[in-house]
Amino acid sequence: MAPTLYDFHHLPHVKTQNESKKALWVTLLLTMFFTAVEIIGGLISNSLALLSDSAHM
């Protein structure tokens, strides 16, 4: 019998999914942090540019 060219592995994707969820949460928390910083900075400095930029995040 001839050897096959493809070797299929059906491994569970739990580790990959957990890593992806962790990366998603870190990204979400960083975005929320910078949004809050821009809102506070915009209110303190009366900067409409910072406030509008924070609203677009």
Swiss-Prot record:
It comes from the Bacteria. The chain crosses the membrane at residues 24-44. Keywords: Cell membrane, Membrane, Transmembrane, Transmembrane helix. InterPro entries: Cation_efflux_TMD_sf. GO terms for cellular component: plasma membrane. The keyword Iron does not apply. To cation A.eutrophus efflux system protein CzcD. This is Uncharacterized protein in glgB 5'region. It comes from Bacillus caldolyticus.
